[in-house]
């Protein structure tokens, strides 16, 4: 009986800790959204709400952010600089920032490209130049392959474009797992200290220094919301297979 009792105690404690973590995660998420509310506007694409910022006049440029980020990465300085000569639009990708998720299975780069392409049409943008950073460049590449008639040029910065050797980090493996992720993500969202998030942001720029004010602008707490953690992990988990499938079609690219 004693082993059964101990097992019951452990299960009860685990369930209580998991429930408490969900409550605390909700509080932290509301605080993050209050501190970093939507900075742009929304466009409806079918049943999906897409968050975007537009600034400037001239030929259209679309900016797509990378993993663990949102459009604030682009509005820190790049949007203002490009807006001197272009009409610049930056989007939140699905599940990141304030754009809705398309579904719970992890949006592919092609699905994300289709959503953002439809959003540009809804906004009246004309054959934009696409600039994607890191993972966002993979989305831009999928966009140019799938919808070449909607793109005038393609700019990829540090973006995965071909299959690579190597696996995922342990964190991505856990968070993308249907069971382990459901257990781990509430604890991460509830208890990961802000100092850890700050340190991760700083390491992105190694060996250079982080630009002054960048961490205060981008809204890093938005990235540890439960929906963002799950979406981010699923996006990363599927990327290699999606790039491998896309690569044979690069000879069809018709943009510069």
Name each model-derived stretch.
Residues 1-60, 84-86, 125-126:
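Alpha/beta-hydrolase fold catalytic core
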Residues 48, 54-98:
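Conserved HGGG/HGGXW glycine-rich cap/lid loop of the alpha/beta-hydrolase fold
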Residues 60, 254-256:
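Catalytic His-Asp charge-relay segment
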Residues 122, 126-169:
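Conserved hydrolase catalytic core segment
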Residues 157-160, 164-191:
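A catalytic-pocket lid/entrance helix-loop region that shapes and gates access to the active site
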